[in-house]
């Protein structure tokens, strides 16, 4: 899969689009095929190293998004493959897929546009 990657704290123009390993859901986690991701002011600060939270590099920015569940880990009870969800995570939404806790994903109607969710 591909993701936008921050390799060093720098302007957003230094972000790169590159191949990374597909995420694998662990217990209580789901993998979401990302259809839309929100861009927030903190994302701009984080990639420049100006935010109080600074993840280890390299990382994919993006706090939130929506998509379709493509796999579930052991003990997942709240979501199933094929569910449309909105999700929140500290970073990682600027990718084709993301793994999130099932508790941080919320069902949305399949008829609801992902870019609005």
Roles of regions detected by a PLM:
Residues 12-19:
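A local structural motif
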Residues 42-48:
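Cytochrome P450 core scaffold surrounding the K-helix E-X-X-R motif
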Residues 6:
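Short hydrophobic "strand-cap" motifs at the C-terminus of beta-strands
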Residues 112-117:
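A glycine-rich, Thr/Ser-enriched phosphate-binding loop motif common to dinucleotide/cofactor-binding enzymes
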């Amino acid at each position: 899969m591909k993701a936008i990657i921050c390799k060093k704290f720098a302007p957003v123009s230094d972000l790169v689009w590159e191949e990374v390993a597909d995420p694998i859901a662990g217990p209580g986690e789901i993998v979401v095929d990302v259809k839309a991701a929100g861009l927030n002011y903190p994302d701009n600060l984080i990639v420049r190293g100006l935010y109080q939270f600074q993840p280890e590099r390299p990382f994919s920015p993006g706090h939130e998004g929506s998509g379709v569940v493509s796999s579930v880990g052991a003990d997942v009870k709240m979501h199933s493959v094929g569910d449309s969800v909105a999700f929140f995570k500290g970073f990682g939404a600027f990718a084709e897929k993301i793994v999130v806790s099932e508790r941080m994903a919320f069902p949305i109607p399949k008829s609801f546009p992902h870019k609005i969710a």
